[in-house]
Amino acid sequence: MAFCIWMTGLPCSGKTTIVRKLTENIPNLAILDGDELREWLSPKNFSKEARDEHQFKVAHLAKLLLKHNVPMGVSTISPYKANRAKAREIIGDDTKFFEVYVNASLAQCEERDVKGMYAKARSGEIKGFTGIDDPYEAPDNADLVLDTENKSLDESAAEVLEFLKSKNLL
């Protein structure tokens, strides 16, 4: 059965790692990674307009995949509440779209950052970086909240699997 797990959270909160772990139990899960998609789908800058455009393109791609019965995990920062609401509207069907908030503190995310993106943002080398000089608006009503600050990424992936089972999607 097709579904869209829309992972949102600060950079380095664990979104992509969790989605990749899900493929161990859901082999046909498509992964729509925001960083990878940005390389060829959207503008390379991090302006509000570029982020909006990127989110809408990812949402339309997810809608197309759902139409063809492809289950997917979308791993994208999705920093703005309005954009996540728009993604839900574009994709439609609340029985198949689930917003998952991957919650970790800014300090924890900076500690996990192997690419040095936070350091570049703090030094001013990168502008508009979420959590540093651009806000992240945490969801008020996510379908599932994962606490990756206090739980391992394996435990978090297991929570997603249990959630999907509770919805009779696995």
Question: Language-model segments: what does each one mean?
Answer:
Residues 7:
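Hydrophobic anchor at the beta1->P-loop junction of P-loop NTPases
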Residues 11:
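The conserved Walker
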Residues 45, 62-68, 77-121, 128:
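ATP-dependent NMP and nucleoside kinases share a basic, alpha-helical "lid"
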Residues 31-34, 69-77:
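Short beta-strand segments at enzyme active-site cores
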Residues 103-106, 111-159, 167-170:
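Small-molecule kinase domains that catalyze NTP-dependent phosphoryl transfer to phosphate-bearing small molecules
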Residues 19-60:
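Conserved substrate/cofactor phosphate-moiety recognition/catalytic segment
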Residues 15:
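Conserved lysine of the Walker
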